[in-house]
């Protein structure tokens, strides 16, 4: 894949800069710092599915990017120039993939990235009150899922133990070597 | 006052030249809003080859936003380029809307080889203030 993409880029781009004095091993991290939860930047190289939000590079070929930065430094980042658009989700289609499977995969990735939710939220302005309410609801939903099923069994036990520990730390009694004892 | 247009051979005939252009690989942009779906087929650089939308397919009003309309729009757009010889394509989907899945399905069914399917919905990093809430 590295060689074919190299050939592709050689035909389109002529090396426009002389090889830099020190070839860097890692591809440039044009990772934009974003506060949104939907634009998570997982740059793990999964051969089938990648979901990314990078401003100039697609890390689906991060592996070949590393290789190319060693082989031909001036063209190592040609990939980043090629895929200039930032995307939220990318799904690489294999050969002869059934239609439903592709759609299911795409939909799942989009849901994981939260694109549609985010879009709906940003359609109209929400004031601070609305935002607080929404965050509260989201937090409740997240915590409920994680801690809900376990709570019913261990609730009383942990609570009582905690209470005891709190009392112990409170220093109600005089220290043992005090003259008053 | 007449501007001196430099005479180049291709300039005068660029209209007819474009229609003959054959592109083996292209990009299909799907813009799926809540009220409509627009499907544009371009080459890899972004120059538009053909486009179609739910509105141009004859649907009007609320029916434009339906997934079936998106399906017909995609089929229309693809039909125009398949005879131009496009085999592989990337798909870029933008916007929320019901047309996303339906158009993707139609593209898949039309027999074009897909390489990537990407979602390029523009996300502000808390930029412009959106319009006020609707009180309906």
Curated annotation (Swiss-Prot), chain B:
Cellular compartments per GO CC: chloroplast; ribonucleoprotein complex; ribosome
InterPro entries with a match to the protein in the record: Ribosomal_uS11, Ribosomal_uS11_bac-type, Ribosomal_uS11_CS, Ribosomal_uS11_sf
Record PANTHER family: 40S RIBOSOMAL PROTEIN S14/30S RIBOSOMAL PROTEIN S11
UniProt-recorded name of the protein: Small ribosomal subunit protein uS11c
Gene3D superfamilies given in the database record: Ribosomal protein S11 (3.30.420.80)
GO molecular function, one term: rRNA binding
Keyword field: Chloroplast, Plastid, Ribonucleoprotein, Ribosomal protein, RNA-binding, rRNA-binding
Family stated for the protein in its record: Belongs to the universal ribosomal protein uS11 family.
Signal peptide boundaries: none
Localization: Plastid, Chloroplast
Binding partners and assembly: Part of the 30S ribosomal subunit.
Main location: plastid
């Amino acid at each position: 894949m590295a060689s074919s993409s190299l050939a592709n880029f050689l035909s389109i781009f002529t090396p426009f800069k002389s090889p830099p004095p020190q070839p860097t091993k890692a591809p440039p991290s044009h990772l934009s710092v974003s506060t949104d939860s939907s634009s998570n930047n997982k740059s793990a190289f999964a051969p089938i599915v990648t979901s990314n939000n990078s401003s100039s590079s697609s890390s689906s070929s991060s592996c070949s990017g590393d290789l190319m930065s060693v082989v031909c430094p001036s063209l190592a980042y040609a990939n980043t120039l090629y895929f200039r658009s930032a995307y939220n989700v990318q799904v690489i289609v294999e050969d002869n993939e059934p239609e439903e499977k592709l759609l299911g995969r795409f939909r799942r990735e989009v849901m994981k990235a939260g694109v549609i939710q985010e879009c709906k939220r940003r359609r109209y302005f929400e004031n601070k009150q609305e935002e607080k309410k929404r965050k509260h609801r989201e937090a409740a939903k997240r915590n409920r899922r994680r801690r809900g099923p376990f709570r019913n069994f261990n609730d009383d036990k942990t609570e009582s133990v905690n209470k005891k520990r709190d009392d112990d730390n409170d220093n109600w009694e005089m220290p043992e070597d005090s003259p008053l004892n | 006052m007449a501007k001196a247009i430099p005479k180049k051979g291709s300039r005068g005939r660029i209209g007819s030249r474009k229609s003959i252009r054959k592109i083996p690989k292209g990009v299909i942009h799907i813009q799926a809003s809540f009220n409509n779906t627009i499907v544009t087929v371009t080459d890899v650089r972004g120059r538009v080859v053909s486009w179609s939308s739910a509105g141009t397919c004859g649907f009007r009003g609320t029916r434009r936003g339906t997934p079936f309309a998106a399906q017909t729009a995609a089929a229309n757009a693809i039909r125009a380029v398949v005879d131009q010889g496009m085999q592989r394509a990337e798909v870029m989907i933008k916007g929320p809307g019901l047309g996303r899945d339906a158009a993707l399905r139609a593209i898949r069914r039309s027999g074009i080889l897909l390489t990537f399917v990407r979602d390029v919905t523009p996300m502000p990093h808390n930029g412009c203030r959106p319009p006020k809430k609707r009180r309906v």
